[in-house]
From Swiss-Prot:
Binding locations of Zn(2+): 437, 440, 455, 461
Lineage of origin: Bacteria, Pseudomonadati, Pseudomonadota, Betaproteobacteria, Burkholderiales
Protein's name according to its UniProt entry: DNA ligase
An example Gene Ontology molecular-function term: DNA ligase (NAD+) activity
BRCT domain segment(s): 618-696
Cofactor field: Mg(2+); Mn(2+)
Length: 696
């Protein structure tokens, strides 16, 4: 007799459980367990079954995330436990004062010995929107914004659309209130803005603004289309632990035992427990530290990683780890005494756009630059910021006289994010692109299909000449130590250097007469120039500054042809035979050497005694064709040394991780590249692993 198949109720339960597990793997552990297509197929199966059996649909089904009607307005929610803000620290003195207050209080309560240091749980301060999730009997019952800390807005319908938020928890207490942050990854934010711009809709200023705007949509269907994420970092109400979970007792003072409503006795332990329930918790960079020195070391370490994280943070948070100690420390006004937010220097600030000028780059690219009223942002005072190109200015609707938001992240060049429209003055002026180069007067043209306008003056343009010479003297090209920007400015302005070949005719006598150049410095520079008379062919090709020809491409072309003469005479078809050289690069090289003036420069270099050396073939072929990506700081090798060794063995080095990456080589403070490699299944090596691969 054939065995009966599962009932619709059993099939629906199985599909829900399977989808729930996939959601946990993806959103909690950042470890997708099935391809997107397979996940989508499971959802379709569940939707079909529920359509056939509507009586079996429950509010916590994965299919019920979207579907609520648009709201007229958000209701109010009174927080059972206030959502307090944290006290802030902005410098080392603030952190040390906080640690001393905590230690003194705990010693006074008999919870810390005189020779002991306080143990803290350190976390990232996510730059998103604070949210409270209330689960009743394991089901998501309500979600609310922080609001004023006492009362927030009911955003339950919108929170339900975020796939990383579990609609049901297994093994949860009767009532569990979870606090956390809703945010948007930077890459997803950029994609959203591109979509918004393509539709002619408003673009967002930053990921936080996008997350807040998405969550406060009255129509949950719009929120469902936005790439929001949620991370839990604390809790509020907790009542009715599951049966079988033993009662735990705290000792808030020596000899005093109090029954606890919580299953763990440390903050870190509670976060682990929330993760075990299936909630997304951002545990990766969290760490326990002791004393003020430990806190400051954590702050510095995270500061170095900040630019590589996939999401924005605006600081770190220190919390006394032991929950009994937290209770003894208590609260003051609107903030806990046991926690502190240590802010990074602001990455965004507001200032006035005084004017827009244009800069001319090495290839003639015209870049609009904002002249700003001085503003302190990202740890430095900023007076200039990039506006990228004319299209970006139009897209952002930035006008001279506007109050604008300026962003500076890590070592990234400051940029104008957008205007504060409500502060726009009546006399704000739109930017008009110049038609002639401000340096040489040549026509400015914008090639069809490109966003960048360019000066047509070539090396006749002093600005292009300066940037070309600076590029050629750089470490990855001819590596002429001592030939920097200020010296090149003097040489070009004096009309002493008109082309790269003129560098090789400089004498110590004339150099010594220049500003800030003594006899010894001049002699050292001439010696460095002499050393650069026998560069590797690939370095010289890269030094010429041919558009679209980077360091690696120049080396590959040099190895393929073996001499400058053969490269200069190569047809586009011959250039396309070089591995990884496509039509754009081949066409660019061909056009460069079709220009008589450029061929003349190569001839002048030869006359000055510059004789490029053929590129050495790889020492072995063990890594032939394999692409490596480097991240973090290695204990012994510099990144340049590791790159040189990989290239010598026939490998390639790229700046970003993709499916084509053969290995990711990591050092200390590896950032988002490591996460991407793990997502794609790219093998990860440390320095020793790389050495072993190289046979060293």
């Amino acid at each position: 007799m054939a065995q009966a198949g599962p009932t619709p109720q059993q099939a629906i339960a199985r599909l829900r459980a399977e989808i729930e597990q996939h959601n946990i793997r993806y959103y909690v552990h950042d470890d997708p367990s099935v391809p997107d297509a397979e996940y989508d197929a499971l959802m379709r199966d569940l939707q079909a079954l529920e359509a056939e059996h509507p009586e079996l649909v429950t509010p916590d089904s994965p299919t019920q995330r979207v579907g609520a009607a648009p709201l007229a307005e958000f209701g109010s929610v009174r927080h059972a436990v206030p959502m307090l803000s944290l006290g802030n620290a902005f410098d080392e003195e603030d952190v040390r004062a906080f640690d001393k207050r905590v230690a003194d209080t705990l010693r006074g309560a008999g919870l810390l010995g005189l020779d002991q240091q306080v143990e803290y749980f350190c976390e990232l301060k996510l730059d998103g929107l604070a949210i409270s999730l209330c689960y009743e009997e394991g089901r998501l019952a309500q979600a609310a914004t922080r609001g004023d800390g006492q009362t927030g807005e009911d955003v339950t319908a919108n929170i339900r659309t975020i796939k990383g938020v579990p609609l049901r928890l297994h093994g949860a207490p009767r009532v569990l209130e979870v606090r956390g942050e809703v945010l948007m990854n930077r890459a997803e934010f950029e994609r959203l803005n591109r979509t918004q711009a393509a539709r002619g809709e408003k673009v967002f200023v930053n990921p936080r603004n996008a997350a807040a705007g998405s969550l406060r949509q009255l129509d949950p269907r719009i929120t469902a289309q936005r790439p929001l994420r949620f991370f839990a970092y604390s809790w509020g109400e907790v009542h009715g632990l599951p049966e079988g979970m033993p009662t735990r007792f705290d000792e808030p003072a020596p000899g005093v035992r109090v029954a606890s409503t919580l299953p763990r006795d440390t903050h870190g332990g509670m976060l682990d427990w929330l993760a075990e329930l299936g909630l997304p918790v951002n545990l990766r960079h969290n760490h326990r530290e002791r004393g003020a020195d430990g806190l400051l070391a954590f702050y510095e370490r995270i500061g170095k990683l900040r630019a590589d994280l996939p999401y924005d943070i605006d600081g770190v948070v220190y919390k006394v780890d032991a929950l009994p100690s937290q209770r003894v420390l208590g609260f003051v006004a609107r903030a806990p005494r046991f926690a502190l937010a240590h802010k990074f220097p602001a990455e965004e600030a507001v200032t006035q756009l005084l004017g827009i000028e244009v800069q001319v780059g090495r290839t003639g690219a015209i870049t609009p630059v904002a002249r700003l009223a001085p503003v302190f942002v990202g740890g430095v005072t900023v007076t200039n910021a990039t506006l990228h190109n004319e299209d970006e200015i139009r897209r952002k609707d930035v006008r001279i006289g506007d109050t604008v938001i300026v962003r500076r992240a890590g070592d990234v060049i400051p940029e104008v994010v957008g205007p504060v429209l409500e502060k726009r003055p009546a006399d704000a002026r739109e930017f008009v692109m110049l038609t002639a180069c401000p340096i040489c007067g040549s026509a400015i043209e914008r090639p069809e299909g490109e966003a960048i306008a360019r000066c047509t003056g070539g090396l006749f343009c002093a600005a292009q000449r300066k940037q070309t010479l600076l590029h050629a003297a750089g470490r990855k090209a001819l590596d002429i130590e001592g030939l920097g920007e200020k010296l090149i400015d003097q040489l070009v302005d004096a009309d002493r250097v008109k082309s790269l070949a003129d560098i090789y005719s400089l004498t110590a006598f004339e150099l010594a007469a220049l500003e800030r150049m003594g006899k010894k410095s001049a002699e050292n520079l001439v010696a460095a120039i002499d050393q650069a008379r026998r560069p590797a062919l690939g370095r010289l090709l890269f030094a010429l500054g041919i558009r679209h020809v980077g360091e690696t491409t120049a080396r590959d072309v040099a190895r393929h042809f073996g001499s400058m003469e053969r490269i200069m005479d190569a047809s586009e078809e011959a250039l396309l035979a070089v591995p990884d050289v496509g039509g754009v690069v081949a066409g660019s090289i061909r056009r460069f050497f079709a220009e008589p003036h450029n061929r003349e420069i190569v001839e002048q270099l030869t006359q000055q005694g510059v004789h490029p050396q053929a590129e050495a073939e790889p020492e072995g072929t063990s890594l032939a064709g394999k692409t490596f990506v480097l991240t973090g700081t290695m204990p012994n090798w510099t990144r340049d040394e590791a790159t040189r060794r990989i290239l010598a063995a026939g490998g390639k080095v790229s700046g970003s991780v993709s499916k084509k990456t053969a290995y990711l080589v990591t050092g200390e403070d590896a950032g988002s590249k490591l996460t991407k490699a793990q997502e794609l299944g790219v093998p990860v090596l440390d320095e020793d692993g790389l050495k072993a691969l190289l046979g060293l």
